[in-house]
């Protein structure tokens, strides 16, 4: 990459970080202006268009980055699990660390998931689906269950995790610890329930052939 390309990428990165820094519990992406973001990044407003077509393209890039960042962290968590440790507890701790270190990235995903922009809703839905698919892959590999079961389990887990994450955004350390414990319990219940249901379906299938009558 040449010097010019490096500088362009650096400025683009500054714009993304500037936009993230201006989000808060009180301020959504929709309230940001191009001028504010450009000023925070240290560039002229007109220079913004060298990097993004408009503010919406910047926002969609932020959604993609937020989802990717979370998925990469969860992959790292699964690598830690491979060396020993509780799957669910390690995953929950990693997720809560992500929220603590990147609250605005998670806020963006939460808000735009049900926001007014169809493009943003689709982008967030796509990121969540990636998250579900990766978790389903892992569950299928580890638990040796059919894809239909692991997808249903992964979707239930991600739904509960995102709900807990929304609660965790604006609470204190002790409340977050309690949330973590509750989330670990809920995910274990889903995991046990999925395994029980799978075994039940297997037993039903095994019984059926012996019960078939000659007609």
From Swiss-Prot:
Pfam family, one: TetR_N
SUPFAM superfamilies: Homeodomain-like
Chief location of this protein within or outside the cell: cytoplasm
Compartments (UniProt record): Cytoplasm
Record keywords: Cytoplasm, DNA-binding, Fatty acid biosynthesis, Fatty acid metabolism, Lipid biosynthesis, Lipid metabolism, Repressor, Transcription, Transcription regulation
Annotated HTH tetR-type domain residues: 10-70
GO molecular function, one term: DNA-binding transcription factor activity
DNA-binding region: 33-52
GO cellular component: cytoplasm
InterPro entries registered for this protein in UniProt: DesT_TetR_C (IPR054129), Homeodomain-like_sf (IPR009057), HTH_TetR (IPR001647), HTH_transcr_repressor_FabR (IPR050692), Tscrpt_reg_HTH_FabR (IPR023764)
Gene3D superfamilies (UniProt xref): Homeodomain-like, Tetracycline Repressor, domain 2
Signal peptide positions on this chain: none
BP term (GO), one: negative regulation of fatty acid biosynthetic process
NCBIfam families, A to Z: PRK11202.1 (NF008402)
Oligomeric and partner information: Homodimer.
Purpose of the protein: Represses the transcription of fabB, involved in unsaturated fatty acid (UFA) biosynthesis. By controlling UFA production, FabR directly influences the physical properties of the membrane bilayer.
Name the record gives this protein: HTH-type transcriptional repressor FabR
